[in-house]
Amino acid sequence: MAPNLRKSHPLLKMINNSLIDLPTPSNISAWWNFGSLLGICLATQILTGLLLAAHYTADTTLAFSSVAHTCRNVQHGWLIRNLHANGASFFFICIYLHIGRGLYYGSYLYKETWNTGVILLLTLMATAFVGYVLPWGQMSFWGATVITNLFSAVPYIGQTLVEWAWGGFSVDNPTLTRFFTLHFLLPFMIMGLTLIHLTFLHESGSNNPLGIVSNCDKIPFHPYFSLKDILGFMLMLLPLMTLALFSPNLLGDPENFTPANPLVTPPHIKPEWYFLFAYAVLRSIPNKLGGVLALAASVLILFLAPLLHKSKQRTMTFRPFSQLLFWTLTANVLILTWVGSQPVERPFIIIGQLASLTYFTILLILFPIIGALENKMLNY
């Protein structure tokens, strides 16, 4: 009998072991769909991004009008642009749900997979930030100015660092050019990191909702989970298309309909919705360096998750107190997101400060304490 090409060919063998004959726990739920959804998001963003880059001009005098030209004169340019802009939002929705799943079910105990995942998140955030600057609208320009200016909080080398990032003494043509370069390059870096992420994942195999070793009960990925993933794709692509076709500017900022003007500051500078939680943490500290450190800590704290796990059980499935804490944290992040979108005045200042304090307290102090407490309760 001739050998099965899928299992013998050097390249197809790798694909087969990753996507077709991969042994998968039989009880993984829909929360395990987000990894493949992120893959679809990345593919969509790269495809639409390449098509947009073909019509974009990275020059301060032409960037805004080149985007307008793409939307007006290029065949389906408006659709490509709307899919790309809103696709970023869906990318972040998926990655935040993916991280939430990881925290809830203890997936962070696969340390290498988790750490590469956090690096992926940081790279994605950098990509989204530099991409937001490219249309060269008012909020693009001022967002770039404010966020890059944060580097000046670094002691001694801060100002040099900012001017080095800008390529001059203010956000100008060199900044736009290098941001376009980075925005083109980083998604391919994300692709590479994704392969590393998957390599580490397939070393250990997937976690499952019970958090127990499932080697005795595994089923092939295809056709069971490949079909389940297709349902996920449909359920994500439908709202994405709806958003892109019916209200493409819903999540954008109206300031970006005005070309960038260094002489006029928008009344309220704020980033896209997916950065608002970190922006709220930044604003809640009145000191510049302190704010920058808190901003960095709000994301980098994820690296500590494996070290802060004190429970004897891996997942939160049978840990009601930890569950309560987890959903409190979720509500807390949503409050931070809302506060980040509000102006800096009472009562938003104090709400932001309390929410920021609660965010770090839950992750650093309460989760380990409750985990240890639940261990004690197991003895009774």
UniProtKB/Swiss-Prot annotation:
Subcellular location(s) of the protein: Mitochondrion inner membrane
A cellular-component GO term for this protein: respiratory chain complex III
Residue numbers binding heme b b562: H84, H183
Protein keywords: Electron transport, Heme, Iron, Membrane, Metal-binding, Mitochondrion, Mitochondrion inner membrane, Respiratory chain, Transmembrane, Transmembrane helix, Transport, Ubiquinone
Membrane topology: Multi-pass membrane protein
Chain sites annotated for binding a ubiquinone: H202
A molecular-function term among this protein's GO annotations: ubiquinol-cytochrome-c reductase activity
Cofactor binding note of this UniProt entry: Binds 2 heme b groups non-covalently.
Residues annotated as transmembrane: 34-54, 78-99, 114-134, 179-199, 227-247, 289-309, 321-341, 348-368
Gene3D superfamilies per UniProt: Cytochrome Bc1 Complex, Chain C
Requisite cofactors: heme b
Binding positions for heme b b566 per the UniProt entry: H98, H197
Main location: mitochondrion
GO biological process: mitochondrial electron transport, ubiquinol to cytochrome c
Subunit annotation: The cytochrome bc1 complex contains 11 subunits: 3 respiratory subunits (MT-CYB, CYC1 and UQCRFS1), 2 core proteins (UQCRC1 and UQCRC2) and 6 low-molecular weight proteins (UQCRH/QCR6, UQCRB/QCR7, UQCRQ/QCR8, UQCR10/QCR9, UQCR11/QCR10 and a cleavage product of UQCRFS1). This cytochrome bc1 complex then forms a dimer.
Family: Belongs to the cytochrome b family.
Extra information: Heme 1 (or BL or b562) is low-potential and absorbs at about 562 nm, and heme 2 (or BH or b566) is high-potential and absorbs at about 566 nm.
Protein task: Component of the ubiquinol-cytochrome c reductase complex (complex III or cytochrome b-c1 complex) that is part of the mitochondrial respiratory chain. The b-c1 complex mediates electron transfer from ubiquinol to cytochrome c. Contributes to the generation of a proton gradient across the mitochondrial membrane that is then used for ATP synthesis.
Record-given protein name: Cytochrome b
Organism: Bugeranus carunculatus
Annotated gene: MT-CYB
